[in-house]
Every structure is written in C-alpha cells, then in structure tokens.
C-alpha cells in the first residue's frame, strides 16, 4: 500500500508528525498537499503540537539581512558558516526590505526598519520565513525612531462554541523607558491601541538592558529593577499577553543592582530561559538555565537555576560587551556568542559625521575556557549608530498562518 491509497485523515495524521522543513519540500507532490501546508489552519495547529521540534539558527547581519547559520561543533576545529540570505521583498519598492531589528516567537519574525530614509515610512512586517507569508503593518510615523522595540507574543482565546482554543498573536511596541506602550492584535484589529494604563509597560519597575528580551510560551521576559527597592537588584519581569500586564517577577542567580554583561536566550524548545552574565568588576562569565518557573502566582515566581558553563577569560580578550547575543548547546556544553564591533574611523574636517567600520565577530566557547573565533566579517563603513546590534536566534520553523486585517488571505513572498 502506498500513501495515495490511504484515506486523507490517515495521511494528514502522518504528515502532522513530519518536521516543517521537510513538509515544504513535499508541497509540489500534490495540489491537495500544497493547499494543506499553505492554507489549512487546522492542520497547522495539529502540526505545531505533534511534529518534532527543529531549530535553525538565524543571524541579522550588518547588511540588514537575515541569513541561516550552519554551526558545526564536530572535530577539533568548530566552524560557523553564514548561508544565502532569506528573501523578504519590500511590497512597495523593487528591492529587499532592510531589517534593522528582529524578534522571534512561535515560528514568526517581527521585523522593522531603522533609519531616517523616508521611503520606508514606518512599516513593520510579521514574517514566516518557512512559508514566505507576510503581513505588512503601518506603525505610524511616531514609531520611526531607532529606540522603539517591536516584540511578538500570543495568548489563547476560546472560540464561539468553547470547543477549542485559538492563538491570538499580538505585537507589543514600547520605548526603552517602558513608556508610550501600545499593542496591535493581528487576529482582529488593524490599529494600535493603548490598552496598558498610561502606556506604562512596567509600572513600579525600571527597564534595564531593554535590548535583551525573549519570548517563552507566548509571554515576554525582560530585565527590570524595582523602583522602590533598587538594592534588590535586577530581576526578570514577565509581560503576559492575555492580561496585557507585566506581573511575574523572576529572580536572577545573583541579586545585583547591575552587571557588566547580561544577555538572555531561550533553550529546550523555548520552554526554558538561559542567561549569560558577568558580574561587575569581575572577569568570570557564567551561563545559567532555568529548570522550572512556577508561574502560578503573580507575586513572584518560584524559579530554580542551574549553572551549565563558566569561563574565566583574560581581560585582554575583550570578547563581550552589553550587546552580546548567544545560543547555548546544553548537551555539548558549548555557547555560540556573537557581537558587533564599531571602530571609529579618521574624522576629516569636510565630513559632517564620524564614520565607523563594522566588524562582526562570532566565538564558540566551551569548557576549560576554550575560545574559538570562527567567524569575522567586515561590513561597509557607516556614519550612523542605528541598527548596530547583531542578533543570532534559534528559529523554530512552523506552518503557523498569519491572519490578514479583516480576515483576508495571507500574502506570500518568494518561496
């Protein structure tokens, strides 16, 4: 018996257990399968729950492009290779969209351009790189500034018959000070709303390291310190997209008012958080992972951390700054760390602004203070400090559908 001889329900049940990237290769097998993978929301939901998770490291380069990353940790000499950039055509212009910032949640990327070029207006895009689906959103000219953050999360809502829960995706837009916060709901609205009281993202708290945010189980985690008790140090706050409030407080392994380096990432399929930190005035750098976060209370989370890596690096190496990003391989006890260096160039009298040479550096750090520099690339000189932060993230390919405003069909880019 071959697959065409099986009933459709059984075929769908089998395909629900095939990794998403493999399904993309099967789209040309039949018209029915193509429609199933592209347009069937029920199948996409089933696939999300039943298919094995896979991860594809992606990097935002100094050329404002998203590139898949091949990481080889086998053998004595590890390597990191950037592959061909992913295509994201600008719908209004005959060129690729320049990505200044990117945030990942649930197989979707939310990207925005940074800079003052008026041709871009203030568009942002929600993008599924696997399927090519996009939704372009007008964010308003007040959100053109580089400092603004666009992040993505979700909550669940019962359908009209209370028979099943539907994921509701929302974009949160905020400034580094946590003010002027607005929310855009992808499923139902086509406008930004300030549902958060007074537009304050973290009432009673001060945002710290606002570049460092991560999504876990649809919620947003970000660093903050309590205004009335700054001596208690930096904690993690959880923004819950169902209540649209910041509430849950997660203590860090050390209670310090500030750190030399503090970076956050998601591990274990987005079910746990990992933390790269270096205490103030110390050379020792550590990576910790949460074992469990008890989020049944809004007063504060019961959390346990496990230290998985520790390095005591020479200060002469100067590997990290506050802008470092990292991915952790728990099994191999290895971290891939990326950051972007800006070297001021000679400033001539006729130049209005100083130029900087951009250099991207990638390191692999293992046990016993082993450091391998496996990637280094120079970008074009720039006279702007906008969009300088390099980002590496663990993208989880999925078939999740992006709903258009008014319930229209999803737009697709190049496959």
Swiss-Prot record:
Disulfide bonds: none
Phenotypic consequence of gene deletion: Slight ethylene hypersensitivity.
Highest taxon of source: Eukaryota
Transmembrane region(s): none
Signal peptide (UniProt feature, chain positions): none
InterPro entries for the chain: F-box-assoc_dom_typ1, F-box-assoc_interact_dom, F-box-like_dom_sf, F-box_dom, Gal_Oxase/kelch_b-propeller, SCF_F-box_component
Domain F-box: 1-46
SUPFAM superfamilies: F-box domain, Galactose oxidase, central domain
One Pfam family, short name: FBA_1
Induction description: Ethylene treatment has no effect on RNA, but down-regulates the protein levels.
Note: Double knock-down mutants of ETP1 and ETP2 show an accumulation of EIN2 protein and a constitutive ethylene response.
Known role: Negative regulator of EIN2 protein stability.
Assembly mode: Interacts with EIN2 (via C-terminus).
Name the UniProt record assigns to this protein: F-box protein ETP1
Record lineage: Eukaryota, Viridiplantae, Streptophyta, Embryophyta, Tracheophyta
């Amino acid at each position: 018996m071959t697959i065409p001889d099986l009933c459709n329900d059984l075929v769908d049940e089998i395909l629900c257990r095939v990794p998403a990237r493999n399904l993309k290769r099967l789209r040309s097998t039949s018209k029915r399968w193509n429609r199933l993978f592209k347009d069937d929301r029920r199948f996409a939901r089933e696939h999300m729950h039943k298919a094995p998770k896979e991860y594809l490291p992606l990097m935002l380069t100094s050329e404002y492009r998203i590139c898949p990353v091949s990481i080889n940790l086998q053998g004595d000499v590890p390597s990191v290779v950037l592959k061909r950039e992913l295509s994201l055509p600008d719908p209004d212009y005959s060129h690729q969209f320049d990505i200044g910032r990117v945030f990942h949640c649930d197989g979707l990327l939310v990207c925005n351009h940074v800079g003052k070029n008026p041709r871009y207006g203030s568009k942002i895009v929600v993008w599924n790189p696997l399927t090519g689906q996009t939704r372009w959103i007008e964010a308003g000219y007040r959100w053109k500034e580089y400092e603004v953050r666009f992040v993505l999360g979700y909550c669940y809502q019962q359908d009209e018959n209370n028979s099943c829960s539907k994921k509701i995706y929302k974009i949160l837009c905020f400034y580094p000070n946590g003010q002027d916060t607005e929310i855009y709901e992808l499923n139902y609205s086509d406008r930004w709303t300030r549902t958060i009281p007074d537009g304050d993202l973290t009432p009673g708290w001060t945002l710290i390291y606002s570049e460092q945010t991560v999504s876990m189980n649809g919620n947003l985690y970000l660093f903050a310190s309590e205004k009335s008790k700054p001596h208690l140090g930096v904690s993690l706050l959880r923004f819950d997209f169902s209540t649209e409030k910041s509430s849950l407080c997660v203590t860090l392994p050390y209670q310090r008012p500030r750190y030399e380096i503090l970076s956050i990432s998601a591990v274990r399929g987005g079910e746990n958080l990992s933390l790269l930190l270096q205490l103030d005035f110390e050379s020792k750098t550590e990576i910790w992972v949460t074992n469990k976060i008890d989020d049944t209370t809004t007063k504060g989370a019961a959390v346990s951390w496990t230290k998985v890596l520790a390095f005591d690096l020479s200060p002469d190496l100067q590997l990290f700054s506050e802008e470092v990003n990292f991915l952790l391989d728990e099994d191999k006890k290895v971290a891939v760390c990326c950051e972007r260096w800006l070297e001021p160039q000679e400033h001539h009298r006729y130049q209005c602004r100083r130029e900087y040479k951009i250099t991207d550096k990638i390191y692999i750090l293992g046990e016993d203070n082993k450091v391998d520099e496996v990637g280094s690339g120079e970008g074009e000189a720039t006279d702007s400090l906008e969009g300088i932060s390099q980002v590496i993230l663990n993208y989880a390919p999925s078939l999740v559908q992006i709903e258009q405003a008014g319930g229209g069909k999803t737009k697709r880019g190049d496959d």
